[in-house]
């Protein structure tokens, strides 16, 4: 992902304030609620029968944190996202058979959740930088798909 120095600084500064567990759980939960077909990949998570069940599900929260921990790792390697996410791409492609479009959807949901959490601090410039990052991560995660 090509970010200007200013964009990298904005992404890094905001990310330092992100509560990964809270934001990750909310982002994954919102994905599962807004795009219910994505729930099929999470059969082992138990009750996903309603928005409140999804949003309060401890397995959703835990996996959301795991997702954002990986995203955090990606932020450390913006110039080599394909390499950073190669194993996860392979896992999601070959073993889990996740539609790569879901990565884009989750990235967009994450941007919305960040905007909700940070309000005025999430300026149009910060949003634009994050849109570049989530698009780059989605592309990297889709890399192993044929």
Swiss-Prot record:
Gene3D superfamilies: Globins. SUPFAM superfamilies: Globin-like. It comes from the Eukaryota. Heme b binds at residues 63, 92. GO terms for cellular component: blood microparticle; haptoglobin-hemoglobin complex; hemoglobin complex. The modification Phosphothreonine is found at residue 12. Keywords: Acetylation, Heme, Iron, Metal-binding, Oxygen transport, Phosphoprotein, S-nitrosylation, Transport. Red blood cells. The modification N-acetylvaline is found at residue 1. It holds the Pfam family Globin. GO terms for biological process: hydrogen peroxide catabolic process. Belongs to the globin family. This is Hemoglobin subunit beta. It comes from Rousettus aegyptiacus. The gene is HBB.
């Amino acid at each position: 992902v090509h970010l200007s120095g200013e964009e990298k600084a904005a992404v890094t500064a905001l990310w330092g304030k992100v509560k990964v567990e809270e934001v990750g759980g909310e982002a994954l939960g919102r994905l599962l609620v807004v795009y219910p077909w994505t729930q099929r990949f999470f059969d082992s998570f138990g009750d996903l029968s309603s928005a409140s069940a999804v949003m309060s599900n401890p397995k959703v929260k835990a996996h959301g944190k795991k997702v954002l921990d990986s995203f955090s790792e990606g932020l450390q390697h913006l110039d080599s996202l394909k390499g950073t996410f190669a194993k996860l791409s392979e896992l999601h492609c070959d073993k889990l058979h996740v539609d790569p479009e879901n990565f884009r959807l989750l990235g967009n949901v994450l941007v919305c959740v960040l905007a909700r959490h940070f309000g005025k601090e999430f300026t149009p410039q910060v949003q634009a930088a994050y849109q570049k990052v989530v698009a780059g991560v989605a592309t990297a995660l889709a890399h192993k798909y044929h």
